[in-house]
């Protein structure tokens, strides 16, 4: 299966600053999100009943959403064994038919900008897009252009470090040196972002 760039090996190299060496990068840039990060977000932000998790991996975020009663569509570019995963490339996918869904995910960092842009492109003005991203996503000329066109409505900055586990292995994951934040978009919003802190 080819990845988003046409690479049939589906192995991505690291771009930008990172506490991981290129050798440590996982296939398809897979780093599972600490479920606690989403648990805390759900205490701060309301979402629609219908959610799409387009980088579901082994279901760490999808399980949290289901436990909170959401109707969750889980997909990924590869099947990592989470029951109900739809195998598809989010960047070439259309919005699900029927009820509009908010999008909540931790995208592959190398394609984070593309994930944000595509999520907003296929969203309606009634849906939210929530991305768990490195705080350094705020940097860069290309991303500045994205922010000028599509400013996030809220940015929830984590005051404590969360671990994103290589290959979903939290037991052996090293402690994190990376600052993360939840970026929340509402299509059509044109104001300044509201910055808040959590955890």
Pin down the residues of each PLM region.
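Class I S-adenosyl-L-methionine-dependent methyltransferase catalytic core
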Residues: 1-199
């Amino acid at each position: 299966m080819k990845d988003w760039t046409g690479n049939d090996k589906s192995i991505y190299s690291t771009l930008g600053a990172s506490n991981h060496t290129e050798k440590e990068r996982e296939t398809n840039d897979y780093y599972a999100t600490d479920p606690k990060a989403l648990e805390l977000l759900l205490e701060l932000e309301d979402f629609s009943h219908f959610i799409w998790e387009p980088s579901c991996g082994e279901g760490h975020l999808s399980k949290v959403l289901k436990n909170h009663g959401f109707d969750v569509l889980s997909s990924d570019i590869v099947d990592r064994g989470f029951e109900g995963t739809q195998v598809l490339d989010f960047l070439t996918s259309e919005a699900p038919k029927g009820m509009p869904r908010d999008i909540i995910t931790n995208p592959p960092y190398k394609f984070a900008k593309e994930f944000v842009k595509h999520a907003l492109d296929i969203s309606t003005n009634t849906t939210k897009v929530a991305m768990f991203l490195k705080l350094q996503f705020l940097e860069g000329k290309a991303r500045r252009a994205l922010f000028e066109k599509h400013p996030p409505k809220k940015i929830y900055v984590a005051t404590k470090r969360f671990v994103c586990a290589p290959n979903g292995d939290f037991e052996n994951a090293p402690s994190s040196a990376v600052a993360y934040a939840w970026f929340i978009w509402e299509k059509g919003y044109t104001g300044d972002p509201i910055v808040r802190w959590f955890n």
